[in-house]
Amino acid sequence: MSIGNIVQCIGAVVDIEFPRNAMPKVYDALVLEDSSETSFAEKGLTFEVQQQLGDGVVRTIALGSSDGLRRGMAVKNTEAPISVPVGQGTLGRIMDVLGRPIDEAGPIASDERRAIHQKAPKFDELSPSTDLLETGIKVIDLICPFAKGGKVGLFGGAGVGKTVNMMELINNIAKQHSGLSVFAGVGERTREGNDFYHEMKDSNVLDKVAMVFGQMNEPPGNRLRVALSGLTMAEKFRDEGRDILFFVDNIYRYTLAGTEVSALLGRMPSAVGYQPTLAEEMGKLQERITSTKTGSITSIQAVYVPADDLTDPSPATTFLHLDSTLVLSRDIAALGIYPAVDPLDSTSRQMDPQVVGQEHYNVARAVQQTLQRYKELRDIIAILGMDELSPEDKMAVNRARKIQRFLSQPFHVAEVFTGSPGKYVPLKETIRGFKMLVDGECDHLPEQAFYMVGSIDEAFEKAKKLQ
């Protein structure tokens, strides 16, 4: 194994010089040698080679804090890419980007390790799926149903409920699905990771979840690679013939970490200051999150939308790869309707009568038409008031307001904050409830009866109490 020396250190980007005949390959992992002069630096600090500059010099990203580094320090080439433990031993454990345990529960009992850089499955190995995955959340099951082995994006600005929605999905699917899950925390709050761990522990599903975290306080190198570490663990389970759930919170921070180091690596920035390799980096990650003939990966990804602008290059690049897009709206959150999913902006490739069935399709489209009509009439109502509307329009507005409220639902994971018990609504109940609403069978009920209830029967009971 060849030894090199640090020649330049700018933030997270470090240049290291090796003998010309022993230059490391791109993506090789390099490790800081232990010596008296490295006492102030992070012990066993790992670097990943990004570029070969020539004359034996390579440009690397530090996967850890570069505090305490200085020129001349010795670095060893491991002659292999970064690898993480995979298999049964990772379940119930919390790991960092390098697969080291951070839950103080001893070493990880796994003999096998896999490199985090893998090729995407070949075209002939892929297996598309049309089986629906029931989530128990009305607005999702009705408007943008998920497919087993599909990819879902939760799009939303700051504070509209991406993480809470994801927690509820994990809570509902991981418990109902009783399969294995991998959670990758990419550049999010450490508190949320802690909450997630305890949530899983209290629900007794911790032994079915592997967790990898590279949170907000960590250097960009960790945040850039932690999604790949989590994905590598999920791929191992898929290749064993299992159906896996892969959660990523938040995919935008993965892009952002790439942006942070891109300029330091000497690349010209592209639109809005993003790295020029944005589409390639996203494609490399997303193409690996797929289902093969041996097993499936169903992935649910939270996507932060900067300044609520869906045309920003980062969310726009993510859109291309998804089967279902769940758009969270600040306007709906402002009305106090949670989950704040926008039923007119959210889409799903599964919303096809041949996949979901004719009745489901008709009800979902009728709900969207009613809400769209209400949206169009809103300006007229604001200027002239309700009295100027035709009887048909008045009826459409009243139904739309009831539908809007019926799309809200109390969550299990929010019980602590709201005090109202969470509700899981089966798909059949969801379709029945909205069918009654659009058919006018609930026109006599007050709209307050539909707010924060589970099934339509609960709305009828609530209406009796309100009278």
UniProtKB/Swiss-Prot annotation:
Whom does it interact with, and what assembly results? Answer: F-type ATPases have 2 components, CF(1) - the catalytic core - and CF(0) - the membrane proton channel. CF(1) has five subunits: alpha(3), beta(3), gamma(1), delta(1), epsilon(1). CF(0) has three main subunits: a(1), b(2) and c(9-12). The alpha and beta chains form an alternating ring which encloses part of the gamma chain. CF(1) is attached to CF(0) by a central stalk formed by the gamma and epsilon chains, while a peripheral stalk is formed by the delta and b chains.
- What is the stated purpose of this protein? Produces ATP from ADP in the presence of a proton gradient across the membrane. The catalytic sites are hosted primarily by the beta subunits.
Q: How does it sit in the membrane?
A: Peripheral membrane protein
Q: Which InterPro entries match?
A: AAA+_ATPase, ATP-synt_VA_C, ATP_synth_F1_bsu, ATPase_a/bsu_AS, ATPase_alpha/beta_chains, ATPase_F1/V1/A1_a/bsu_N, ATPase_F1/V1/A1_a/bsu_N_sf, ATPase_F1/V1/A1_a/bsu_nucl-bd
Q: Which residues bind ATP?
A: G156, G157, A158, G159, V160, G161, K162, T163
The entry's protein name is: ATP synthase subunit beta
Q: What is its EC number?
A: 7.1.2.2
Q: In the UniProt record, what gene is named as encoding this protein?
A: atpD
Q: Which GO terms describe its molecular function?
A: ATP binding; ATP hydrolysis activity; proton-transporting ATP synthase activity, rotational mechanism
One Gene Ontology cellular component annotation?
A: proton-transporting ATP synthase complex
Going by the UniProt record, its keywords in alphabetical order are:
ATP synthesis, ATP-binding, Cell inner membrane, Cell membrane, CF(1), Hydrogen ion transport, Ion transport, Membrane, Nucleotide-binding, Translocase, Transport
Major localization class: membrane
Subcellular location(s) of the protein? Cell inner membrane
Sequence similarity = Belongs to the ATPase alpha/beta chains family.
CDD domains listed in its UniProt record: ATP-synt_F1_beta_C, ATP-synt_F1_beta_N, F1-ATPase_beta_CD
Q: Does the keyword Ion transport apply?
A: yes
Reactions catalysed according to its record: ATP + H2O + 4 H(+)(in) = ADP + phosphate + 5 H(+)(out)
- On the tree of life, the source organism's domain of life is Bacteria
